[in-house]
Amino acid sequence: VFLRVYGGPHVQYVQRRWDERWGLFDQVMAQRGYVVYSLDNRGSDRRGVAFESPIHRNMGGPEVEDQMVGVRWLKEQPWVDPQRIGVFGWSY
């Protein structure tokens, strides 16, 4: 599994549409047997001030906690080798 992270602020990764920026990468990785996993943590866009504001002057806390919830969920899945979870992404 590749965990793609973007800690914020702004941007919404998870959408119900083809993503021109990452769609081809995700498709190639899937064809090679990998899963690319993304979640929108607190601080990401389009969910209102209450969802976006927790990282204001508090970066490195709430968004990391949210990503770790995702990692724990991934480790419980039968199709995931918990010893082979990588992370990539960018932000502040």
Residue ranges and their predicted role:
Residues V1-Y92:
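Serine-hydrolase catalytic core recognition
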